[in-house]
Amino acid sequence: MLPAPGFHHLHLNSVDPDAAINFYTRHFPSTAKTSWAGLPALASPNNVLVLFTKVAAPPPTSPQTAIWHFGWHVTDSRKSLETYRSRPDVTLLPLYTGDDGGAVFISSDTWPGTGGVLGLTKPQIADAKARAVQPTRVGGFAYMKGPDNALVEYAGNHPAERFNHVHFFQEDPYCAQLWYQEHLNAPVYAGRTAPAQMTQASCKVARGADRTFPALEPDGMFRSPSAAVVFGDVAFLWYMRQGEQPLVSPRGHLYDHIALSVADLDAWVAKLRGEGVRFLEEPYKLGASRAVMIEGPSREALELVEVR
C-alpha cells in the first residue's frame, strides 16, 4: 500500500495576494510570507502552505462548494478574541446561540455541546437552561472574515499555533470517509469514525433533522452525520451540505483546490486510474515538481504534488 499523502497546501484565489498574506501574518504570527512554484504563499510552521493566485475580480464564494472554511489552532482562543477586538482590520463573526436571537463571538461563551457534537439542539438548550448549565469560558472556537471574504476559524486552547484544518461539506460524509480511505489511504481522524461495518452500500444516511447551536447562521446548522480524515496533522472535517442544492466545483472560487504531497506521482496516478477516480487534469509541471488534479466525492478538486 502506498503511504498516505501529506497535506501540502490550500490554494486560494485573491484580488491582492500580498495584502492577504500580510493580513494572515499579522493575525497569526507563527506564519510567514514565502513563495512556492513562483506563487505568493503563506507558510505555517507545521510545513503547510496557503498558495495564492491573483485574479482580476473578487473570487466567488457561492454557490456552495465542498470547501467551507479553513482554520488555525491557537494557544488561547479567548485571548486571541480580545486581541482581535482591538484591531480595526478584523471583522469578527457572531455565533448565534439559538436563544431568542442571542449571539456570542466565541463558542465557550454559550452552552457547551454534548456527546461529541459541537452544538446543542433547541430542546437540548432548553434542558441546559433548566439545569443551569454554564458556559465553560475556556478555549472554544470563533470566526473572522478574512481577505476576499474568506471564512477563517481559530480554535483553542492548543499547544502551538498552526494551520490545522479544512472544513468541508459533503453530499454524504460517511461515503466521503470511505472514499478517502480507499483511494487516498487516508487515516481516520480521531473521534470521527464512521459506524461499525459501514460500506459503500450503507454509507448514505439521512441528514439529522435538528439544527444545532452555536452556528454562523441564525437558524443553526446541521452537524449530523459528521466524519473526517487527516493528512499529516491537518484534518479534513465534514458535515453534510446544509442546503438542498448539490455542491458545485470549487475551481475559480475563493477556495480553488487543496493539494496533497506524494513521493511517487506515477504510482499514485496508476492506482487512482485503476480505481476509476476522475482526473480533472492530467500530470503537469508545477514549479520544479509535477502534479495531477483529481475530483473528490463532492466535486472537491484535489491536487497531488510530487515531493521527493
Predicted regions and their residues:
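Post-signal peptide N-terminal segment of secreted/secretory-pathway proteins
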Residues: 56-75, 79-82
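Vicinal oxygen chelate
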Residues: 1, 82-168, 190-230, 237-241, ...
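Mature N-terminal segment immediately following signal peptide/propeptide cleavage
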Residues: 2-37
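Helix N-cap motif at beta-to-alpha junctions
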Residues: 15-17, 74-79, 172-173, 262-266
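Extracytoplasmic/secreted envelope proteins and their assembly/folding machinery
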Residues: 7, 17, 21-25, 77, ...
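Solenoidal tandem-repeat scaffolds enriched in leucines and small polar residues
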Residues: 172-196
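Conserved acetyl-CoA-binding loop of GNAT-fold acetyltransferases
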Residues: 26-33, 88-91, 182-188, 277-278
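Short, solvent-exposed beta-strand edge segments and adjacent coil->beta transition regions
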Residues: 5-9, 65-69, 161-165, 253-257
